[in-house]
Amino acid sequence: MSSATAAATATIAAAAAAAAKLAATPAPAPSRRRLTLRGNPTARRCVAAMAVSTPRSAAAAAFLERRESERALHFVKYQGLGNDFIMMDNRDSAVPKVTPEEAAKLCDRNFGVGADGVIFVMPGVNGADYTMRIFNSDGSEPEMCGNGVRCFARFIAELENLQGTHSFKIHTGAGLIIPEIQNDGKVKVDMGQPILSGPDIPTKLPSTKNEAVVQADLAVDGSTWQVTCVSMGNPHCVTFGTKELKVLHVDDLKLSDIGPKFEHHEMFPARTNTEFVEVLSRSHLKMRVWERGAGATLACGTGACAVVVAAVLEGRAERKCVVDLPGGPLEIEWREDDNHIYMTGPAEAVFYGSAVH
């Protein structure tokens, strides 16, 4: 056995031992509702990272089954192309297990678990199988999240111990979303129809093409950007460049400077997500995103959908594209027959953890 193999084996064994020790440790009785993640490392309890497979491992199953028997806040960390979420089993209540303020603390990458948001699996309503709610890393609540809904589907399969292909009806703030777990482990999601009417997005920019806001002028930071606005249940402002700079090289952008100026622009009364796009070919796009309430992230599923819609409306791309994001590629198709957008991409569990509350 090589030294590298031996080290890896020892690491896995240590992780399993840590998980077993945690499972045997009784959770302290709560005195009042307060997350003990910030500023108190001795009170924080985390499980060592472990790999997750389907069917789920015995260690993963044991951890998930502890939910009903202990008074600790259990979670599973998931990621989709680097867009990461703290997933919580909230099927027993329509009230989230943590407040927006507590969610922001959990998402803190220095004093908390670290994530782009907290997602709750809640009871379904209006004929849906489940309800999905999200708190962003700043505590705000978005209507939907494309990468998050893929993680949501994989988390449900883990909770219900489901194998093979499955689809679910998910109630979200953006309406009914239907993800399908495929045989290769990827999740294909029917994201519904894009909303193009300016007031419904919402944006105060005037319509330029029928009722749609396509290649409208938007003054930001001394430049006139040409933007197309799309809602995927949440607002998106898509730009391929300024009037002065027709071809955008997205890697050259400093998102931390320009992103907030789009997000909080007066033309977007509900704020906006912003996608900066580079056209590689008519079926291949590259984007970077500044997300409303989360900032620069490695991926945004609804953003990738909005980008393809905008590219089609501007005559830059076909209806089926690969969209490269910093975290990896997504397959996006805007079908002409039903006007629905379909997104396909990965989602996987990263680790399991607990926080006393």
Swiss-Prot record:
Instruction: Give the pathway.
Output: Amino-acid biosynthesis; L-lysine biosynthesis via DAP pathway; DL-2,6-diaminopimelate from LL-2,6-diaminopimelate: step 1/1
**GO annotation terms (biological process):** lysine biosynthetic process via diaminopimelate
What the entry lists under PROSITE patterns is as follows:
DAP_EPIMERASE (PS01326)
GO cellular component terms attached to this protein's record: chloroplast; cytosol
The protein's GO terms of the molecular function aspect are: diaminopimelate epimerase activity
Q: Which cysteines are joined by disulfide bonds?
A: none
Its top-level enzyme class, in one word, is: isomerase
**HAMAP family the record matches:** DAP_epimerase
Q: Which family does it belong to?
A: Belongs to the diaminopimelate epimerase family.
Q: Which NCBIfam families match?
A: DapF (TIGR00652)
Please state what the protein is called. Putative diaminopimelate epimerase, chloroplastic
Q: Which organism is it from?
A: Oryza sativa subsp. indica (Rice)
| Highest classification ranks of the organism | Eukaryota, Viridiplantae, Streptophyta, Embryophyta, Tracheophyta
